[in-house]
Amino acid sequence: MRIAFYAPLKPPDHPNPSGDRRIAKLLVQALQLAGHDITLASRLRTRDASGNLLRQAKIADLGQRLAARLLGRYARSGEKPDVWLTYHLYYKAPDWIGPIMSAALGIPYVVVEASYAPKRAGGAWDLGHRAVETAVRAATTVICLNPN
């Protein structure tokens, strides 16, 4: 199966080590060992640590433009992924690409490790909070690695 993999917090090939990067790498390796063809769909990091609405809006716009570009690339190549998989989205680092891609391509949207906190509604990260809610609602499947 061809899987488009995306980690909005930190891509698996990011030069700075972190637990998030490690888990992303392990997910990719596990899927490859299972025989799947994994493509890193994007390296766009969507995290806004400061709660800056203007920055969040710019990141959202960038994600939407990147999705349009990726759709064009898939159309030109004649090949598309069988599934879109996003690892770890939360209100400070939402997925602005995956829901667009899966809807446009008619493929499943799988989320691994989604954090949705209703208390974030209306706050400094409301835009990201609403994006996570949209992504979780659009997801075909949500896989929870950490039950806490």
PLM region spans:
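N-terminal subdomain of nucleotide-sugar transferases
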Residues: 1-45, 137
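Glycine-rich, highly charged phosphate/nucleotide-binding loops
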Residues: 55-75
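Short N-terminal targeting/anchoring amphipathic segment
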Residues: 72-94, 107-110, 142
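A conserved, positively charged/aromatic
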Residues: 113-140
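A short, active-site helix/loop in glycosyltransferases that binds the activated sugar's phosphate group
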Residues: 138-148
